[in-house]
Amino acid sequence: MKQKYLFIASMALAGCGSMSESNKYWIQYKDIDQSVKEVSFWSREQFHSPSDVKGTVYQRDNLTHLATSTPLGEIYHIYDVNHIPMNVIFLDTKTQRSLNPQNAQDMAQLSKATQFDFYEFGKGRIAHAVFSAKTGLCQDFKSKRGVALKMATNYYTDASYKGYYVSVIHAIIRHNGQHTDFAYTPAFSIADTKALAMTQALEKQDGERVAQMNLKEKVTLLTNIVCQ
């Protein structure tokens, strides 16, 4: 299957680098329900094609021990418009099975599901989105009903991934790019006062615009990958 491409919305924060070397570390993020969680990345030593599993993400509640962590899902790659690979998880909410975005059968299965979780790691951010439909994802996406989207995107302010700004959005999205019931809420977890002030100023200037771009990004995720 050909590579799948996705437009990326990003904030111009300081630490927008790769998370490829974070295997041994736990990174904190705030989820859609505002609970604080931590994730760690364990890469596969060998994979033979671009469509192979690249690794596994483990998750735990904030400040608990490794023994209580559980596998969140398997990492696959999709590609942005610059052909840069993105670390993602497509998780069927009902079965809790990780699905391969490069596998036509997996995407056909997902297209008929009523809900799935999407995670993205890298480019200085961690995002978790939940897509929900009443009858089927792609059927509703291409109809007036649309698909309910709720998402939290954590943008990290430096390479240590200690401070972050969170963009929480809710909306109904549709195949034609139109959306309704849009709501955007910012949150901050930044100890350094100067970094907090800078990030709050940036959010005030660009936060809602980037949130709208995130909606367009998730529309392309369904259009180009799940419902093509």
Swiss-Prot record:
Signal peptide from the UniProt entry: 1-15
GO cellular component: plasma membrane
Keywords: Cell membrane, Lipoprotein, Membrane, Palmitate, Signal
Membrane topology: Lipid-anchor
Lipid attachment site numbers (S-diacylglycerol cysteine): C16
Subcellular compartments: Cell membrane
Lipid-anchored residues (N-palmitoyl cysteine): C16
Family: To P.multocida PM0015.
Protein name, UniProt field: Uncharacterized lipoprotein PM1509
